[in-house]
Amino acid sequence: MKSHPGIAVACSALVFFGAGVMSQAAVAAIALSPKQDASRIAEIMQRLRDVQRFNAVSVAPNGKAVAWTVTEKTPAEKGGNGATVAAADKGAKAAKTGPAADGGKPGELLQIAAADGARVRTVRILRSAKSCQYSNLRWSPDSRTLAFLSNCNHGSGSDKQFDIYEVAATGIAARRITHLRGLVNQLAWTPGGSQLSFLYVEGDVHPVSAVSATKALVGVIGETGVERQRIAVLPASGGELHEITPASIFVYEYDWASKGDRLAYIGAPPPGRDNWWIAKLYTQAPGGTPQVTLDPSSVDGALRGLQIAVPRWSPDGSRIAFIGGLMSDQGVTGGDVYLIPADGGKPADVTPGIAISPSWLTWTGDDALLVSSIAGGSTRLSTFVLHGNQAATAQPLFTVAAGVENGTFSSAVSLSARHDMLAFIDSTFDSPPEVYSALLKTNSSAEPVGVVEPPHAITRINERVQPMWGKSVSVQWQNEGFQVQGWLLFPPAFDPHKRYPLIVFVHGGPSSALRPAWPHVGYGPVPLAAMGYFVLMPNPRGSFGEGEIFTQAVRLNMGYGDLRDILAGVDKVEAEYPVDDSRLGLTGWSYGGFMSMFAPTQTQRFKAAVVGAGLSDWKSYYGENSIDEWMIPFFGASVYENPMAYAKSSAIDFIKNDRTPSLIVVGEFDGECPAPQSFEYWHALRAMGVPTSLVVYAGEGHGFEKPKDERDVLERALRWFGKYLATDSAVQTAEAH
């Protein structure tokens, strides 16, 4: 059994965190020649490509099977005749996969295994002409059938179109049951298993997401091409599709009542990309008239004007649990747990003052919830026992020093019907992705009350991949009455007698948290560490993980309190580790990009910055972006009502103070942090005589999708930091203490 490298199990002696295994070939490499630099970067990129990614996992309700998706190896990694291989590792319970079958573009495998990861079978889709992608793995209530989405039967020019397929739990041949023409997501079985439901945007497969590239802004803006996402149902065996929610409400997520007679969903008027921040909670009978159960814009109390997510019906259908709080990004959830009567009424906060951020939940009994929370920079799974509308009692089950997911929602796990087994995808800075499973102790009501078997890997697909960077440690510090946490990555082959440069990597959001994870191919903190830097990843005020007071402390104060937290973290690291304060770098993406623009106008400590999808002027940004509704909860009013609140946090208003050489990168069709924001900052730095470079990537959105662009950003960033943070030698000998 491969145990998770960073787990703390409640009421147990088992407490151990990342071991920091390093590659034997790892070397400190900052002041390298261009040829050596390019070689080192290529080596890092190849190591990241060596990893096969899990994108979804689902436990059968009876707890006897687990399904997952995993990326195929790239063509360069294939051997033999290229045939797909997927079989149980002889003499062990964990599964291994082989390379893709078609020798073309890497795709994914869909596999079904026994609960312990043994006896793996790879699902086949007949007449598939290319590599495939899979998502939304959903078991039928009787555990006999797995439904899922795939783009297998569409040509290479239409790989964004997904359809619904089904495969028997004991089989490998899947059957296509739909021929859809539009975006589909959040597949689910209706209670009883007679129908399938999903979110559907008819006639348009363009992702409705703030991070995706925007469409060309042509035609009547606000009217032409507005997507309408509705809940649709069809017979489980295939048949006619029916949309059961009105076109006037864009549905973001939903849940069925246990009897299948009502829906609860989060929705707002189209366009959906912009209006999630003002969404309401609705209930509705299938095909009936929607009823507003909760409108955060008008409710009294702490929830007023905030965001809501993850609605879940109680087993008896009398209440709906959800998460409410200050959230900057759809799909990145954190806040408090609330209960509200299904027919409406006053919502009750059952986790008031809790010093963690619940992120996902599900009912496990009439008065019990299983809640996955961001705790510091880790993930904690707990049972919350409810006491009416009073504060719930938390019973922690285990904490994982990483983020977890099952391919549906942030921090979600997949759970058996009796709540005694769960599975999730996990990785750390030290361990590549695998599927993990845990066995839970339940009481007579099937409510989890303890851990029988802590999380352990049931796959070993990436067991041979080792990091090329140093160990990671959690760092805590106090600042202005707040407890702040961050992660520190070490350079490879760390020598405590040398002094190293430090790069601060600021996460996006601000309502988010950086938790350990194996890096994707492309730009991020880990490749920086692999090149010989210390990398600090702080979770300053405004982040999830320390409770709602901490998260909301950034309101009307962006760039100030959070920057002071970050600088205090740098001081903490410098006091404990051999960091050269004269070689500090700063970087981040999205909100981290904003901080990388704003911080150099407030402090001269940073000698170089790499700005990803940044934001330089909140005033002009308000009229440029496609998601302006997100700002009012943070600034208290629109820019037209209170422009000074926006000017206060705008780098452009303080640009004469900026002396930091800055590389700026952005996507051409970024709707969340539009390219003009980067142009403004670049133009201003040039006017001030500050070294700068701006790169705009064709066709990219807020989150880059093209591998060549991801690589290019990383290469440019490493060269930029190498130029401004390097010295004549890779590291300096530390002064004697």
Where are these regions (language model features)?
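A short helix->beta-strand "capping" segment at the edge of beta-propeller domains
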Residues: 32-52, 241-243
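Residue-level detector of Asp-centered blade-edge/turn motifs that repeat once per structural unit
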Residues: 61-62, 141-142, 191-192, 258-259, ...
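A flexible loop/linker signature enriched in serine peptidases of the S9 family
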Residues: 70-110, 127-134, 149-165, 179-185, ...
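Blade/loop signatures of beta-propeller domains
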Residues: 29-41, 107, 225-234
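Serine-hydrolase catalytic core recognition
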Residues: 410-737
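Short loop/turn segments that connect beta-strands within beta-propeller blades
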Residues: 114-118, 168-172, 235-239, 285-289, ...
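Hydrophobic beta-strand positions that form the internal "hydrophobic ladder"
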Residues: 66, 143-146, 193-196, 263, ...
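Conserved beta-strand position repeated across blades of beta-propeller domains
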Residues: 58, 138, 188, 255, ...
